[in-house]
Amino acid sequence: DKSGVMFTVDPVSKDAGRLVIEAVFGLGEGIVSGLITPHHYVIGRSDGAVLDEFVPVQLLAIMCDSESGGTQEVALDEVQGNSRVLSDGELGELRVMGLRLEACFGKPQDVEWCIRGGELSLLQSRPITTR
């Protein structure tokens, strides 16, 4: 399982030709809390090409804890921790979702998403509010 955020316009450079995706293994709480450095992908809007990628080692994930009903920190093994969070196919699916959301709402979007069991789900979409 994996989750993250996507911006349909580069929130730093404001480049509309680039989508920015950040991803972690497990729940997105790891990104929001700053506990886990996410994988960072910049992809081309028109063709989905990976333009830039930062893939730090992730040795920890935030996962659901079915016993407590909360979350727990789980250590990742070396193989998974050194693996890329998102495949090229998943990046492509996210790109398509982001562009559809932007077309639907008429503004660049800040999107929260997750992938569980190979299925991409939209959690939230809102206009980008960075200045």
Language-model-detected regions and their locations in the chain:
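Conserved mixed alpha/beta core segments that line enzyme active sites in large multi-domain catalysts
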Residues: 1-131
